Amino acid sequence: MAAGCLLALTLTLFQSWLIGPSSEEPFPSPVTIKSWVDKMQEDLVTLAKTASGVTQLADIYEKYQDLYTVEPNNARQLVEIAARDIEKLLSNRSKALVRLAMEAEKVQAAHQWREDFASNEVVYYNAKDDLDPERNESESGSQRIKPVFIEDANFGRQISYQHAAVHIPTDIYEGSTIVLNELNWTSALDEVFKRNRDEDPTLLWQVFAADRLARYYPASPWVDNSRTPNKIDLYDVRRRPWYIQGAASPKDMLILVDVSGSVSGLTLKLIRTSVSEMLETLSDDDFVNVASFNSNAQDVSCFQHLVQANVRNKKVLKDAVNNITAKGITDYKKGFTFAFEQLLNYNVSRANCNKIIMLFTDGGEERAQEIFAKYNKDKKVRVFTFSVGQHNYDRGPIQWMACENKGYYYEIPSIGAIRINTQEYLDVLGRPMVLAGDKAKQVQWTNVYLDALELGLVITGTLPVFNVTGQSENKTNLKNQLILGVMGVDVSLEDIKRLTPRFTLCPNGYYFAIDPNGYVLLHPNLQPKNPKSQEPVTLDFLDAELENDIKVEIRNKMIDGESGEKTFRTLVKSQDERYIDKGNRTYTWTPVNGTDYRYLALVLPTYSFYYIKAKIEETITQARSKKGKMKDSETLKPDNFEESGYTFIAPREYCNDLKPSDNNTEFLLNFNEFIDRKTPNNPSCNTDLINRILLDAGFTNELVQNYWSKQKNIKGVKARFVVTDGGITRVYPKEAGENWQENPETYEDSFYKRSLDNDNYVFTAPYFNKSGPGAYESGIMVSKAVELYIQGKLLKPAVVGIKIDVNSWIENFTKTSIRDPCAGPVCDCKRNSDVMDCVILDDGGFLLMANHDDYTNQIGRFFGEIDPRMMRHLVNISLYAFNKSYDYQSVCDPGAAPKQGAGHRSAYVPSITDILQIGWWATAAAWSILQQLLLSLTFPRLLEAVEMEEDDFTASLSKQSCITEQTQYFFKNDTKSFSGLLDCGNCSRIFHVEKLMNTNLVFIMVESKGTCPCDTRLLMQAEQTSDGPDPCDMVKQPRYRKGPDVCFDNNVLEDYTDCGGVSGLNPSLWSIFGLQFILLWLVSGSRHYLW
């Protein structure tokens, strides 16, 4: 009985699948649908193969083997050579640093401090003179130089090699005795700057960052008014990561915040801001956490131990600090017990160097001696204390805490003292480095960051400069323990890239380098989008690629300094980040000795183990093409586009005197004119690059002349194209090339790189533009890599393809899918059917073809936005898999700023949120001025001036760094057919799915979504803003890293009796007034142009 019921139920379900709910006509059988798909596939592949000439181009390469050789890409040899070249480059820069540091110490030791200077005695060029042309008068005791500048291609700006420039922060009085003395003795560095450049003309910026100024060479205006007029300069070299890194060893820091009831109002706001500023003095080599205390102590965030001080973790801590509230009573014992126990927890990843507690409080009577006696008897943990706000507490107890624990005591009575007093602790941490002498003289290399003087992405080598005044020749008499400053030398990433040539590796081969934190120095996906970001560019290798267990292993071995090689199959994200392909890659890595970036790797796909090298012969460059009509180089001239097809060449550095240009026509003319004047064998040229592009020009021209031009117009084909490794792109006919939108640099072209990784014909969806014309009008791109075996060696030197007219494709498709006879509406895919949706998607889930006109206008759109429920079901049945990836280099509009109405784009039109936020700054500034007026009468040396943070005012004016997430879809497996019911609760939709062999396409036939309303929530693929992975979870399993090899955190000779107090502060009250009145003016409605 039970078996009979089960059989009846099965038959009923089967019949309901065959007969759709909206029609009595049966749904086409899988066999029928497959026959349609097979016919479509055959027609498409035949069309693409015939029209593109993929076989013919392969024949041309094989026919003319005498014009080139096949050379090996020996991965081990290539990576070793590149590693040694990078090592040599950084070593040369390090030598320049050492010369500068030695001279600086020598000159300063001989310098006689002076209280007075004669008028115009100190001569220098102030880099900020051009910021205010009407205010170029010199301060008392100094005289300004007026350099003659020339435009320099290496720096991309106005330069004078005859002088150095000086930048003095806005909060520093240029005429002060300290500044005049620093200007005086650092002027001797100019000659060393020049000698360094004479020895190595490729040197870029050389900088000495002292306490109150930065001297850099060559001289250049700080701001180019022609590019960024009316910009307020708020730069301070002391806040730059490279200066902070060079001034002290890594830190384990616990910030302890008093949140008792007495800490309220303005004091609490000052503490919040002070903690945020303190966090900005930390780099990725440091570890930190923030705890609050009153009668109890607790972490302010989800972090329960020290965490790496990276950008994301610091943001979590800043957000948490901004939410703390004040209540209860102060118990220093509870607070310090909590701080010491967390700071001394060695079971977590940490810096294992300077151990620091930073106490922010409004003061108190308790000293907590027994806690220090218990946890810090040997004084291995430094305690810095900050008395914040105006109050009547005795400063003695918290000053005692600092003095007893080798720290320093600071007072922050107002906003004006925050910036300077939250960075002064670096001088204390620098004492052991000075006392260590030459042992501490080790060049360190920074993370990648954007140069303040618009040099682009750079790394900086740093070396501390010590005050050796009074030191004996044998360095046993150490009378001084102060750091004078940090010396820096920049290295452009472009210079390093030139040592890792890529144009023989094929577009999917690349080098990358990482540091001990796992951050990349080189990687094709290292592309920060925020040109104004002050943060270092810290992109982890596992975030630059699609992570898997093998890559984690490779990263760990590289950090450990091992050499190795591994071949495996991996997921590869496309250049345009819309697709994911699967490909075999071989990773080969080796150490780079003597640098922080000690690890270099080369990644090669299997088809780039060999490459084509054109023979270096005059006959190649000047011979006529095999057709005999014109020289190979002449086929690149715009005058010959009608005959040879519209031609693009990759904008590469073929010769030193031939600069790449984004204007293809201009570049082609310059290229041909150069070739006519000079042979490619000219010493200033890259002979291999030029010969290869000329070789490809001849081969592709022969394809056009002997094949494409002889074919009759093929219906449905809008264009044909060929793209080569050598950098040639030809589009035929000429008219089609005039609308060509692909990247002329073939190594950065998404469809080209995808074609190499796929053996099939790759159909590429155009970009969907909601507000623009239909994307389908440009045609559907179909491409195929040319595959060769020359002497048994696999090569893929080019990609050919066509663009298909969508309307012709739809017409052929509907004819293919019509059944005869067909009495009902369900039996086929007739155009604009009311009950049947027939679509073709690519492997990324993008729409390429449909039987509905309203779908046709959405060609190129992700199917999850068109039929969300069906797309979700395609994932559920394992047709598609997906990968969610994060981009940590994105920029977004400020989240708090809504779209504004009319008004000049450069003017600040604040939102309510902005007004509330900045309102506090205005209020606090007003209070600060009143406090300082009163305090100056009693304590004229109490306060320190400060530069205000640029981001406080400009964050809402431009893009902000942010995290975005994007989901890429791809075929999960090789299964060809899927059938079933899409259940929508009250109704269902029958569907059948069939992949098209030898392509990246899939055909879907499904009952119309209009016949069965279902879940309409869009499934998004496009990039969206995101919070990224939860940092609270990430810190529980931190990625493997190694800190610096050396640590200078304690020295028995250290004199720590200088531990702070108001007597040590030397303010510039009028600087504070000026800055804060400017602040009030800015936030009170002035339409000041900040950029």
Swiss-Prot record:
Source organism, top-level taxon: Eukaryota
Carbohydrate attachment residues: N92, N136, N184, N323, N347, N593, N769, N876, N973
Cytoplasmic side: 1083-1091
Record PTM Phosphoserine, positions in chain: S119
One GO MF term: voltage-gated calcium channel activity
Principal location class: membrane
Domain-related comment: The MIDAS-like motif in the VWFA domain binds divalent metal cations and is required to promote trafficking of the alpha-1 (CACNA1) subunit to the plasma membrane by an integrin-like switch.
Subunit structure: Dimer formed of alpha-2-1 and delta-1 chains; disulfide-linked. Voltage-dependent calcium channels are multisubunit complexes, consisting of alpha-1 (CACNA1), alpha-2 (CACNA2D), beta (CACNB) and delta (CACNA2D) subunits in a 1:1:1:1 ratio.
Name the UniProt record assigns to this protein: Voltage-dependent calcium channel subunit alpha-2/delta-1
Organism: Rattus norvegicus
